[in-house]
Amino acid sequence: MLNKEQLQTIIKLQAELDLKIVQTKMIEESQDVLTAKFLALLVEIGEFANEQRCFKYWSSKPASSKAVLLEEYIDGLHFIISIANNLKLNLSDLKIVEQKYDNLNLAFLDLFSETLALAKEKNLSIINQWFNIYYTIAKLCDFSGDDIFNGYLDKNKINHLRQEQNY
């Protein structure tokens, strides 16, 4: 998983991107923006699951490439870090513990559940459990901490460019 330095860098970069979006789009931070971020996170988790294809029992087509899966994983990471920044939750205090799952379907279902719980309760203990699950999914997908960190840096650059191009 990410080391503390990598996580702190991501938190800082996400705060800078969020500020740029607010300024570029002239958005007033409000509960509506936070609600939109939670919905966006759920959508990104769904897109990740869709590319993973673990739930598609009717299909013999394999999961998308590791690069595609990592990109979807990173999209979810962008939103959860943005949400944590919004809520002023100190992610440096996270205690990540790998979870045990018989299959990815159960992990994704738990991740959806924790996302909805976080949208209601907005506390560090729920976000810690969210990260436990997300970390476990990363391991099951064979993503290293460096894969995640470098993937985040690449996507962050793309997101800044998109803002500059009036995305």
PLM feature spans:
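Flexible "arm" and connector segments at domain edges
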Residues: M1-Y167
